[in-house]
Amino acid sequence: GNAPNAAVTFARQGAEVSFISVVGDDPAGQTIVRVLDDEHINTSKVLIDKKLKSSFSTIMLAPSGERTILDYPGTAFLKDEHINFSNLDSDWLYVSSVGSMPLITKIMKRAHENGVNIAFNPASYELKNLQECADLLQYVTLFAVNKEEAKKFVDGNTIQELAAKLSESVKYTLVSDGPHGSVATDGLRLVTAGMYEDVPVIDRTGAGDAFTSGFVIKIAQGKSLEEAITFGSANSTSVVGAIGSKTNILKGNVKLHDMPLTITRI
């Protein structure tokens, strides 16, 4: 899912990563933990709940690279007892879906109080609870959504307009529009990017996660908007070239070429 995909990007870029979640005591849960362990991600904060079955997805892939995902939510709906709040003491916290608005609010509030930078990439559950989701932005450092999701929060026709308006609420905003490009802002400048490369698409699964997490890790490492959006775009481009959401996630010290960027001031 979103968070494991992001965790692998962070780890392959040299970050010290801990994964906080819950899995069932079953083959799917064991596989999740093993895959993360193999990527040198700390899984000591993963709770195994023997009463629940792990979340998993079945992906039906078309020759075009498009896919249909059949999802079994399982442990996706977290509860307070699944989270050790003393673990919320990192430099950055990447939050995707928690499956409970009261719990995600509690997590973000506690992390914010601890001085943690929060990157938030809401999933469908959070977006269905729009007002509560919008209220979370007071705790967020970096907010990442696609164009249609951004329109739920602010008015605007272009990704540039949407990002500029969202930047009034958070320090960094990232708005994507699939193959039509993306825009990032720090509240002062808008950096608009197109495609990194036009490559044959094998599997689009995880492309959005690769883009967002690639941007997040470079901002967390103190890189510029230009460097962050370039790396996110390159990471996404790499991922669609192979089957599997983690297979082609870029590793450290990869050499990237420049890509066309348009920079404007807000």
Can you name each region flagged by the protein language model?
Residues 57, 117, 142, 171-172:
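Proline-centered loop/turn at the N-terminus of a beta-strand
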Residues 92-161, 180-182:
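Conserved beta-alpha-beta core of the PfkB/ribokinase-like small-molecule kinase fold
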Residues 12-92, 256-266:
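Conserved N-terminal subdomain of the carbohydrate kinase-like
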Residues 4-12, 107-110:
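Histidine-anchored nucleotide/phosphate-binding helix
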Residues 127, 159-266:
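Conserved phosphate-binding/catalytic region of the ribokinase-like
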